[in-house]
Amino acid sequence: MTRHLFALSLLGLSFALNPSFAAAQETLRPLAEALLDVQADAGALETRIETERFAALKSLPENTPIRMTGLNAKWRLPFVIARDELATKASVTFKWTPSPVLLPVKSQLNLRLNGELERSLPITTEEIGRTVVTTVELNPKRLKDLNELEFEFVGSYEHNCESPADASLWLEIDRESTLTLSKQKIRVANELQLLPSPFLDPGARSRLTLPVLFPVRPSDKTLQAAAVLASWAGKTADWRDLSLPVHYGEAPAEGHFVVFATPETLPEFLRGTAEITGPEVRIADAPHSDWAKVLVIAGRNDEELVEAAQALALEGDRFAGPRVLVTEPPRLPPRPAYDARKWLPTDRKVRFDELVDHPSQLRSRGTFPDPIAVHFRLAPDLFVLPRTSIPMELSYRYTPPGEDAKASVRVRINDALMGYEVLESDESATAPVVRRVAALDAMAGFLRALSLPTVHLDAANTLEFDFQYDVAVTDSSLPGKCPSASLTENQVEIDPASTLDFRGFYHYAELPNLRLFTLSGYPYSRFADLAQTTVVLPKNPEAQDVSTMLAAVGRIGSQTGTAGVLVTVSTDPSPEESVLISVGGSV
């Protein structure tokens, strides 16, 4: 057999990730009071002050201010508060510049938090045309898990005749403006239904850290259980960077962590709890902390640790209560190659609704609808060059442009323009109207057979549909007549039944190729459950060796979107092993 071998250096395992927060965001449930432990002395908890730049909270173009106009008068800033955090104070400090032609007082800037008005700032004579720095205190009682801060520009430049399309109506906000939150950690209840919270925050935009504790030096089977958990953590972390520091013997000083334990290795802080009667997952209070939790992967022996970790990786979203006993080993049928959840299938046409988390991601609305983005990944060894294009059947619906107005749709693949179509009015539409949803009966619909140029394809791809509407401004030369602009609420939608067709391509890659491994975990990710992968560690591995191994396996899980529940770990590999990952100079 051919052996594929990569050695991971302890000098550092670092991967560059491209966050795509615009991709579908899961709505986070607010913390229910029933899920919080009562704090005897909430004031004793340490308060941390965190300040985030607007540009860090929302992807913004470099060196470009946030610009609002009469036609595009609102801008929204999303931000997340973790489930185990309580915001006691919140404020926003922003630098802004209004147009010099605005009428004072009549023009204003409104701030809303989660739909509720926080502050209305009339633009004074002294502020017109000048850069102003303003701090607004926000009501912390309105904060939830998933929040949205909205800026609304209300501009006026004439007492009688004015048009929202006038170019002199604008207000700019500096992208370096900041949001400041004062937070306290709170202790959530011992409830597995909250997973992956509080151990991994689904709304975090930065690096995630999940320490792993081994009460004693781990066996190969215990390391295998840890690798399965790391793969689940990587799948959960998705595009975020993930760190899994390893501790031997001593629990981390603070923060949430995971521990692997049998009756013989049960750490002191868990003694006296429920007896271990089989593979199980439980949640408990962490030692030396007023708020942290510990996720316990337990079993009567090392083999049951693997079963418990596999159950968490495969069925953790169905866990409930403080403790779950695994009564039957998880069913692990063999999986075919290239069936990773994140990789586009190549044996059939793929519908667009398979590429998004929620149907709403295929819709957009507004005077100027935001582009609709569809993200998809390809197997890293998919050989697309022999063909010049990929068939795409695209059906879309849109609000027809008004009389004398123009509209178009631009289709881009990885920022490269691949198609342009003029959107015709309802009266002049030549294609049949699609009427699949009653609410969309007023929208014109078209079916187009397009092709994606293969030269622009990569392992990770973004297909963007940018619907652009022009506003028709009517200008009258008659006395007493004012120019007018029709600000229609336009709605656009990509039909979920639209398809991409990657059938007929071959898989080919020259190995070894560290770039493919870094980008997608290939060749190990070829089987997403890592059924043919063995990670080789030195005998008696150091904590850093194990941490590097967990980071590598977690990275593969993040790129496939699939937990590697069949990965094996060995400190004494047999020569028959066919696909190996070597850590710490072990081979």
Regions found by a protein language model. Give the residues of each.
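Positively charged n-region of N-terminal signal peptides that target proteins for export
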Residues: M1-L5
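Bacterial N-terminal signal peptides
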Residues: A7-N18
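Signal peptide processing junction and immediate N-terminal pro/mature segment
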Residues: N18-E26
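Solvent-exposed alpha-helical segments and adjacent loops
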Residues: Q25-V587
